[in-house]
Amino acid sequence: MAKLSPRDIKRKIQGIKNTKRITNAMKVVSAAKLRKAQELVYASRPYSEKLYELVGHLAAHVDTEDNPLFDVREERNVDVILVTADRGLAGAFNSNVIRTAENLIREKEEKGVKVSLILVGRKGFQYFTKRGYNVIKGYDEVFRKTVNFNVAKEVAEIVKERFLNGETDRVYLINNEMVTRASYKPQVRVFLPFEAQEKEVEELGTYEFEVSEEEFFDYIVNLYLNYQVYRAMVESNAAEHFARMIAMDNATKNAEDLIRQWTLVFNKARQEAITTELIDITNAVEALKAQ
């Protein structure tokens, strides 16, 4: 490798400084988006839990054995809903959840189960379509401004219809989820068949239904399924901003380290250049004296 001149080193340092400004700006933006996304996460969780609790209450009143959404079947065909990000520059955020999905797919295929994918987020869609996986539907640009509930509803409807029609025997939902305010990890859940823990009748109080209990129960179950996909997208969105904030913070710190290292190299090169010039001047003076 050719030795760099002080001018080249200075140009390199300036390039690193420019990169540092970009990564620092991205960190600040991600931190601001993270605060809003976390507010949505912690607002959505109680609603989701109450919906699940309500389904459990109602399950004590209706015969779930006759509801096809509760039908547990032998796995021959499986659908996987995978939520990833639309963008990169978020560390291992996308690769970890994609690896989790691949492990599940491999496990099922080794047992002779056919796996179909519904992919929410550009990164997952690009990854699995390029590798020839069986992709039923893919969505991108779903996290551009806010989490799109219509996409969540459509995804839930697709897998619900496939389950009811017998095209799939089980549906899994995979996404990154915030574990604490400062950590996240991939989660795998069974989306269908639906499982609800029946609540004791004593806890229920009295319900008066304007429609049949079965109709109301079906409505609440469908609402819950829609919201589960939405919540997975909300959790993933918050985790993405957190991952990007950390990645950009690390990139900024690495840039600072590089600037310090190259500054030392620059100072050394400049000192060597000055020393060389002084030696040349001294030699020239001595040569003149010799004449």
Curated annotation (Swiss-Prot):
This is ATP synthase gamma chain. PANTHER family: ATP SYNTHASE GAMMA CHAIN, ATP SYNTHASE SUBUNIT GAMMA, MITOCHONDRIAL. Its main location: membrane. HAMAP family: ATP_synth_gamma_bact. GO terms for molecular function: ATP binding; proton-transporting ATP synthase activity, rotational mechanism. SUPFAM superfamilies: ATP synthase (F1-ATPase), gamma subunit. The gene is atpG. It comes from Aquifex aeolicus (strain VF5). Pfam families: ATP-synt. Belongs to the ATPase gamma chain family. The lineage of its organism: Bacteria, Pseudomonadati, Aquificota, Aquificia, Aquificales. The keyword Chaperone does not apply. It comes from the Bacteria. It is found in: Cell inner membrane. Keywords: ATP synthesis, Cell inner membrane, Cell membrane, CF(1), Hydrogen ion transport, Ion transport, Membrane, Transport. GO terms for cellular component: plasma membrane; proton-transporting ATP synthase complex. GO terms for biological process: proton motive force-driven ATP synthesis; proton motive force-driven plasma membrane ATP synthesis. F-type ATPases have 2 components, CF(1) - the catalytic core - and CF(0) - the membrane proton channel. CF(1) has five subunits: alpha(3), beta(3), gamma(1), delta(1), epsilon(1). CF(0) has three main subunits: a, b and c. NCBIfam families: ATPsyn_F1gamma, PRK14110.1. Produces ATP from ADP in the presence of a proton gradient across the membrane. The gamma chain is believed to be important in regulating ATPase activity and the flow of protons through the CF(0) complex. It is a peripheral membrane protein.
